[in-house]
Each structure stands twice: as structure tokens, then as C-alpha cells.
A protein has these predicted regions:
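Asp-based, Mg2+/Mn2+-dependent phosphohydrolase catalytic module
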Residues: 1-59, 65-74, 87-109, 116, ...
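Conserved phosphate/oxyanion-binding catalytic-loop motifs
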Residues: 84
Length: 304
């Protein structure tokens, strides 16, 4: 955990600055509640992270069906906002359908969506290289992808880091060498540094991007939490799906990560809930890290 937090802190200069979403909030003293359901009367909508809120690994969190039903009963609007870019958000939605969760496709937004929205602003002459190997390549004419066996490191004029499941030291060395030679920009569609897995943490694109920055000084653009574009996109889709307006200080992001979920929500003018029972802080330490990093949620909840 400490290593993951250290990488996030090293990336803080590239992250947005938090702000207080509620003028009356005692933001440096988060309110602790036993269950997330207790805050439902305080909000009109929730953005739910995927891992650590809806699921852990390949299984849904105990009680998620009951929580979603209670949110609906209290007329709280729901969106899923996840840092996931290896595949399209439709894959995540299909998983939720398999579990019997009552989301429709329009309610699920991933960090890949924010990158996809940016593609129209990139010249068609730029060859975009999708990395790593275990991803669905970006749908763009003339693009190249490791997943397709293309010579990405020699052909790409821009690298799009979508996932890191198949990424290793040889790939990292090749990326750093290519950028050192060609000075291509690096777009990170999943800013996560690490995710709990099998008693430890996986290295996610944010971790490898931090190493690339240190080694090459590469110019980076970020498209998932905590960066503003993904929150604005999700907010727009929230209002479109429910066909009504929402006040930002009545919308809360629920997640297990201080540096992505909580910081990003604050910077976007939303409220936030740190859920500690299932994800990054499932073994404790949330209070200490909040004070160390000075990233404050509005609420801390242990379980759903």
C-alpha cells in the first residue's frame, strides 16, 4: 500500500487540485458512517466506482443488489464511473448484467470513454499506438496495436496506454526507448497506479506512466479519474439519462482510492465517499493516509 501511495504522491503535480464541494462542509473532518446507505438522504445522485465498490475481483460485493435497490427506492440516481480502458465500457456492463445488477448500458462510463471522446481532436495523420497486448485496440483508422502484432514502438506517433495486464519490463524498456528517440506523447486512459490482487497489488498504467515520465520526461495527457474530463463526461451523461438537472454538491463519488475517486470528485465540485471495506483500505490505514496526503472525503463508510 505505501508503495502505491508513494507513486500517486509523485504524480500529484500532474493531478488537479481539490476544492471544497459544499461551502458548509467540515471537509477536513470527514463524517464516518457504518454503511453507505446512511448517506442516501444527503444526495441526489451517486457515481459508483467499479472495483472496491461494486465488485472485488470477479465477484460482486456482498450486499450490492440490496444497496442498489434501496438507492432506487430513495430516488437516488446512479452512474458507474470506473478507471478501466483495456476494453470498452460495454464489457463492464455485460459483467454487471451477468450478476443481475440493474444498470443499463448508458449508466456505465469508463475512462476509455474520455479518451475516445478526445480522438476527434487528434489529427488523422497521427498514428496512434494502442498498448498493451491484452486490450481491445482503439477504433481508429490507421492505428497500430500491440494486440494485433504491429510494430507499435517504431510506427506510432502517439502512444495510448489502455491497460497493463500483459505489460512487463521488456515492453517498458521498448516504450522508453521509443519515446527517447521520437518524443511521442503518451496518453494514459487508466491513471490507476495499482489495484489489490491476490494479497498484493498489480501494476496498472499509472505506475508504468510514472516510470516513463521519470525516464524520459514525456508529455502526458490523462483521461480517467482524478482528471476533470471523465467527471464532466459522466455528469453530462447523468443529466442526459435521467433527463433532469443536478446540483454538483448533491452528487457524490463513491470509491476506494483517495488519489483517483476522492481527489477527482473534489476537483470536479462533487462530494465524495471513501468506502474502506473492500478495496485499497480493506486492511485498514485509511485515516492515516487521509492525513498524510491531505485528501479529504466528505464521508467515510465501512460497507455498503
Amino acid at each position: 500500500m505505501e508503495d502505491v501511495i508513494a507513486v500517486y504522491e509523485a504524480l500529484r503535480p500532474l493531478m488537479p487540485s481539490p476544492m471544497i464541494s459544499d461551502p458548509d462542509s467540515t471537509i477536513t473532518h470527514p463524517k464516518s458512517v457504518r454503511q453507505l446507505v446512511e448517506i442516501l438522504p444527503e444526495v441526489d445522485a451517486l457515481f459508483l466506482d467499479g472495483f472496491g465498490v461494486i465488485n472485488v475481483g470477479q465477484d460482486p460485493v456482498d450486499g450490492i443488489h440490496e444497496f442498489l435497490a434501496e438507492a432506487e427506492a430513495q430516488n437516488v440516481a446512479l452512474m458507474v464511473l470506473t478507471n478501466g480502458a483495456s476494453h470498452g465500457a460495454e464489457n463492464t456492463w455485460a459483467k454487471y448484467q451477468k450478476w443481475g445488477l440493474p444498470f443499463v448500458r448508458e449508466q456505465v462510463v469508463s475512462s476509455r470513454d474520455a479518451l475516445t471522446a478526445e480522438l476527434d481532436n487528434i489529427s488523422s495523420e497521427v498514428i496512434i499506438g494502442s498498448i498493451d497486448r491484452v486490450v481491445t485496440p482503439l477504433d481508429r483508422a490507421g492505428g497500430v496495436a500491440l494486440a494485433n502484432g504491429d510494430d507499435v514502438f517504431n510506427e506510432a506517433g502517439l502512444f495510448a496506454f489502455l491497460g497493463a495486464t500483459g505489460w512487463g519490463e521488456d515492453d517498458q524498456a521498448a516504450l522508453e526507448a521509443a519515446i527517447g528517440k521520437g518524443n511521442q506523447p503518451l496518453y494514459i486512459a487508466n491513471p490507476d497506479v495499482g489495484a489489490p490482487f491476490d494479497g498484493g497489488f498489480t501494476n496498472e498504467p499509472g505506475y508504468w506512466a510514472a516510470r516513463t515520465i521519470k525516464a524520459t520526461g514525456v508529455t502526458t495527457s490523462w483521461f480517467g479519474k482524478p482528471h476533470r474530463a471523465i467527471f464532466d463526461l459522466t455528469f453530462a451523461r447523468l443529466e442526459a439519462f435521467y433527463n433532469r438537472k443536478f446540483e454538483r454538491n448533491r452528487v457524490a463519488m463513491v470509491g476506494d482510492s483517495l488519489h483517483t475517486d476522492i481527489l477527482g470528485a473534489s476537483a470536479a465540485g462533487l462530494r465524495s465517499v471513501l468506502l474502506t471495506g473492500y478495496g485499497l483500505f480493506r486492511d485498514g490505514g485509511a485515516g492515516e493516509m487521509i492525513e498524510l496526503c491531505k485528501i479529504y472525503p466528505d464521508w467515510i463508510a465501512a460497507t455498503l
